[in-house]
Design a protein with these regions (language model features):
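Acidic, histidine-bearing metal-coordination/catalytic regions of metal-dependent phosphoesterases
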Residues: 1-162, 168-232, 236-238, 242-272, ...
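Active-site neighborhood of phospho(di)ester-bond hydrolases with catalytic His/Asp-centered motifs
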Residues: 79-80, 159-166, 227-234, 279, ...
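Active-site-proximal segments of metal-dependent phosphoesterases and phosphodiesterases across multiple
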Residues: 283-293, 302-348, 444, 449
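A short, polar/proline- and glycine-enriched secondary-structure boundary/capping micro-motif
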Residues: 287-290, 381-383, 635-641
Length: 675
């Protein structure tokens, strides 16, 4: 049944709130995120609902091997790290919803145009811009060239949409899922015009027939396409997976996409002996036994020798093991690959999100690809810290760099069973990523709540230091210090005594060693220097503001002592907040060039642009091709479509600078080991 369109944009806004990007540096958000991480790490393992799912529900295995279109082709879409700000999330949902996209490549391989089918047919002699997707210059150039739709590569909407983790931010509440995910996707594809239905599942195929679901009177085999499958990321796990299971595992529809799974992991049999597996790694933990048993049974009893596997996991552990020098989590993934996939199958492609950019690694032979495509709507992550080479365990002897030598030691053979992955492509480009990192300089302007918090902390620290200065130097009151002459040469002498005052000492240690604890560069020196810089800045601000307000040459509020004291503390909040948060921004920029704390350097900016998703295609010969689609600038203005037909989006782009997608690196044909 088609979702009824609201009568007006106002009616839509009364049902869904179009959320902005999350202010990750807002004090309340920082506290909430920190508590979520701590509580999840403490209780997450003890509240593992994956085993409960196995006890209550049959495993989610579905057969799409006979679901090709009339040309014998099969399409599916992949997107990850999705529901944050409306503009970025809806921009990607809008593109996913289009029935067909058209590309044309130049000789250089760069994308020249990306058009929606209706726009190609609506080009007029006047060159009028249709649906606001194309610029005037592009329309004129296309009209003058006389090119036709046949000159473009046609990219169809997937019959399946895979959401690869972190479907909502910052927390997986019912309200956040509704506003940040359901609203944008329902508006983008409220229904599907003339929806196709998969052929009945055959008894003899790999996956057994799916029984009638307890929550629905409609048999699974009769559910219209497209279908939706999801795996949870760490943000989906913050409530123990409660909201995720309610939304994605009970047969609900999200716009025109129909959910089917009943667990947080699934297996899909695709045409031409391709499989897609989606695994649930919880919080970087090992796979639970019921999940391993589920995939083991499929691999042993349902897969044929040589079947090709696309593996979807919520986190690119292959990257993190290189960045953090900790391979524990990646070892869990490798063990799953070696013990379950590789005995019968061939792992060809691994997809992940978690890092909010596009980054592809491939082996020297090109027979294994690992792609991070976390550009579904969340704030941008850096790319210039991505390692150039990765040395990883091989899944299957055919992928190892060398065969084990008979006379070699165990350690030598272990090294020989490694395979090198090279960084093939990133989006945004590394030079762009470095430039965007400089935006952290604007932290006090982009995050006024954080600046206010820093200012209040500076004011409190200043008051404690002045009290300590008074007591340690024999003064009775704070006013005695205010009336005294604080010369520059006294700042580092008598204030040194103030730092020995109990409360001042506690606060100083809290600042210095608190920031040292979060340091990441060479014995955490970056954090230590950062903390010392804040202490020195606060002392210098005290001297400057006292001199400005209470020196003999002060021009403000003479004979108004209490008002001048009040003014001093207000100035400390405002000036200290600005300079203190600016110091944090400077620290993050410096760290970005040291390739540390990059998550914070980009989180403080909440950049909505440089988004991406993948469109996968299996042709009639069984060749898998990946189309990585990127958007440099998401649309910021939208126009309500009051007369949207069935299958049409409720909001259309109204921003010539936004929603202009392109192929990030052209079409990527996946090579097989024996080809």
């Amino acid at each position: 049944m088609a979702t009824k369109q609201p009568n007006s944009e106002e009616d839509f806004d009364s049902e869904f709130e179009r959320k902005p990007m999350v202010d990750w540096f807002a004090p309340a958000q920082l506290f909430d995120s920190g508590m979520k991480v701590v509580l999840s790490n403490i209780f997450g393992v003890h509240a593992d609902k994956r085993e409960m799912q196995a006890a209550l529900q049959q495993g989610s295995c579905f057969d799409y091997s006979s679901c090709q279109d009339d040309n014998g082709e099969f399409w599916l879409d992949y997107i990850a790290d999705i529901g944050e700000g409306w503009n970025s999330t809806y921009s990607m949902a809008y593109l996913l919803a289009q029935e067909q996209l058209f590309f044309k490549d130049k000789d250089s391989g760069e994308t020249k145009y990306l058009l929606i089918q209706e726009q190609l047919s609506e080009l007029s002699d006047s060159g009028e811009k249709k649906k606001y997707l194309l610029t005037q210059e592009q329309l004129s150039e296309l009209s003058d060239s006389g090119e036709k739709k046949e000159d473009f590569t046609k990219i169809k909407r997937g019959k399946i949409l895979i959401m690869g983790g972190d479907e909502v931010y910052p927390t997986p509440t019912r309200e956040e899922y509704r506003n940040r995910l359901i609203g944008p996707y329902q508006a983008a594809l409220p229904s599907v015009k003339e929806a196709a239905v998969c052929p009945p599942v055959k008894e003899a195929t790999a996956c057994p027939p799916v029984k009638e679901a307890a929550h629905s009177s409609v048999k699974e085999k009769e559910l219209p396409l497209p279908h939706l499958f999801t795996i949870p990321g760490n943000h989906d796990w913050y409530d123990g997976l409660t909201s995720f299971l309610r939304l994605f595992c009970q047969g609900h529809k999200i716009g025109g996409w129909q959910t089917r799974q009943n667990r947080s992991y699934f297996a899909l049999k695709l045409p031409h002996n391709w499989w897609l597996w989606g695994i649930d790694i919880q919080f970087d933990s090992d796979l639970d036994k019921p999940q391993r048993d589920f995939f083991s049974e499929i691999a042993e009893k349902q897969m044929k020798k040589g079947d090709k596997v696309i593996l979807c996991t919520a986190k690119p552990e292959w990257v993190f093991c290189a960045l953090t020098k900790d391979s524990k989590c990646y070892d869990n993934l490798v063990r799953f690959e070696k013990e379950i996939i590789c005995p019968n199958g061939v792992l060809v492609l691994t997809l992940s999100g978690d890092l909010h950019h596009y980054c592809r690694y491939e082996t020297d032979k090109g027979t294994q690809q690992k792609i991070t495509a976390g550009g579904g709507g969340a704030f941008l992550h850096a790319t210039h810290n991505m390692p150039k080479k990765l040395l990883l365990d091989a899944c299957g002897e055919e992928n190892a760099s060398e065969k084990p030598a008979l006379d070699a030691s165990a350690e030598e053979n272990a090294v020989q069973k490694k395979v090198t992955y090279s960084r093939a492509k990133v989006f945004p480009e590394m030079k762009t990523s470095k430039r965007l990192a400089l935006g952290a300089f604007l932290l006090p302007l982009k995050n006024w709540k954080f600046a206010l918090f820093v200012g209040l902390f500076y004011q409190l620290y200043a008051w404690i230091l002045l009290q300590g200065y008074a007591i340690m130097n024999g003064e009775k009151t704070l006013m005695a210090i205010i009336h005294g002459k604080l010369a520059v040469e006294l700042v580092f002498t008598k204030f040194g005594l103030a730092l020995l005052y109990g409360p001042a000492e506690v606060f100083t240690l809290l600042i210095v060693f608190g920031l040292w604890f979060f340091g990441k560069w060479k014995w955490k020196l970056d954090g230590l220097l950062h903390g010392i810089a804040h202490v020195l800045l606060n002392i210098l601000l005290i001297w400057f503001l006292v001199y400005l307000n209470f020196s003999e040459s002060a021009l403000v509020l003479k004979n108004q002592e209490m008002l001048r004291v009040l003014l001093f503390f207000v100035e400390m909040i405002v000036v200290g907040g600005f300079l203190g948060s600016l110091l944090v921004g400077v620290y993050l920029v410096i760290c970005s060039f040291l390739k540390i704390n990059l998550n914070e350097a980009f989180a403080c900016q909440s950049i909505p642009d440089y988004k991406n998703f993948l469109r996968l295609h299996i042709d009639k010969a069984g060749q898998l091709t990946v189309y990585p689609i990127g958007v440099k600038t998401v649309c910021k203005k939208w126009k309500w479509n009051p007369k949207a037909k069935e299958g049409e989006s409720w909001f259309e782009p109204d921003d010539s600078r936004g929603t202009l997608p392109h192929l990030i690196e052209g079409s990527l044909q996946i090579k097989l080991p024996n080809n």
